[in-house]
Amino acid sequence: MALLKQLTPVLVVDAVEPGIQFWVDRFGFKITNQVPGPDGKLVFASVQFEDIEIMYQTRASVMEDQPSSVGDLNGHSIALFVTVANLDMIEKAVEGAPVVKPRHKTFYGSEEIYVKEPGGNTVGFAKF
């Protein structure tokens, strides 16, 4: 039996809604879970496309739930790396998103583009 079954990133952001809409609108992800806070705005949500799942949680709700993690929540220390079948389609889908690194060929044999999603996290798309 495998020790690990799945790895799902939880992106800690100021606002959940823009992040989930990025994946839903541009890539056809489905919203699988939503948790509103007292003001009705989402404090947590997850999206999924086939076997790929991404979770978002607000920085404020993490700090409320785990006050000791306040110092760990500044900045962004994760980049998502997504292997894709068609980089041309991805480039069209991310049009208008802030580009971190334009489309380029890498020394390890892939062609990639890196953008920022609305929460400020870097997402790289690679075609091997």
Q: Model-predicted segments: where are they?
A:
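Vicinal oxygen chelate
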Residues: 1-10, 30-82, 89-116, 127-128
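Major-groove DNA-recognition helix of helix-turn-helix-type DNA-binding domains
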Residues: 27
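Short, glycine-anchored, charge-dense loop/turn motifs used at functional sites
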Residues: 117-123
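Conserved active-site tyrosine of GNAT-family acetyltransferases
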Residues: 19-24, 94, 120
